[in-house]
Amino acid sequence: HAETFGVKIINDHIDEVSLSSKPFLLKGNNEYLANSLIIATGASALYLGLDSEQKYLGRGVSACATCDGFFYRDKEVCVIGGGNTAAEEALYLSNICSKVHLIHRRDKLRAEQILQDRIFEKEKEGKIEIHWNSQLKEVLGDESLVSGISLDSGKEIKLEGVFIAIGHKPNTDIFTTQLDMKNGYITINSGLNGNATQTSIEGVFAS
C-alpha cells in the first residue's frame, strides 16, 4: 500500500543509530542519513525463560492467540498470566477451544474489571478454568509436540497448547541512551498542540 504513494522500501535491520545531530545516522548492513525519523519498532512478547518453553516454541507454545489459536480448535489449552493481555487471550481462545486453563500466580486478576467479568462468565459456562496461586513449572511433551504442563504445585494438566501472556518488552534498546523513555517506552509530547508524536529530540517521532 505504501508503495503506491512512492515510498521506497529497503529491507535491512538497523542495529545502531546516532541522533546527536542532523542528518541522523542509521547503521545496518548499509548506512542511511535522514533529517527526520519515525520510530515504529513495536514490542516483543515476554517469556518465562523456561527451557521447555523455548523447546516447544512454535510447536505448542505461542505468545499470540489471534495468530495461532485456530490450530487448537476444539482442543484444550492454557494461558499464562493475569493481566489484560492474558484475559483477552483467554476470552478469544474460549470461543475456539474446548477448554482454556488460565494459570495465574496470584489470588486475583490484574485485568480491567470488564475483562474479569467476562472471564468469570466463561468460568461459569465451563469454558475457562482458573488456577489461582499457580505458576508454570514445565511444558510437557514428546520430541515434537506439547502434551501438557506441570505446575509448581506438582499438578499436571493434559493439553495441547500453551499461550504465554505476561506482557511485552518494547523494541527500543538501540535508543535507550539517546531518547527520553519510561519503562522502556519512548516518551512523546502527546496533547493537541501539534507534534504530538515527537520525542525528546526534534525531528524524531515515535508511533
Spell out what each predicted region is.
Residues 81-83:
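Glycine-rich Rossmann-fold phosphate-binding loop(s) that bind the pyrophosphate
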Residues 90-91:
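Generic hydrophobic/aromatic pocket-lining and core-packing "Φ" positions
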Residues 86-87:
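N-terminal Rossmann-fold NAD(P) dinucleotide-binding loop
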Residues 2-4, 8-26, 31-32, 95-191:
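A Rossmann-like FAD-binding core segment of flavoenzymes
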Residues 11, 73-75, 133, 201:
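Phosphate-coordination loops involved in phosphoryl transfer and adenosine-cofactor binding
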Residues 44, 49, 55-71, 166-207:
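FAD-site-proximal beta/loop scaffold in flavoenzymes
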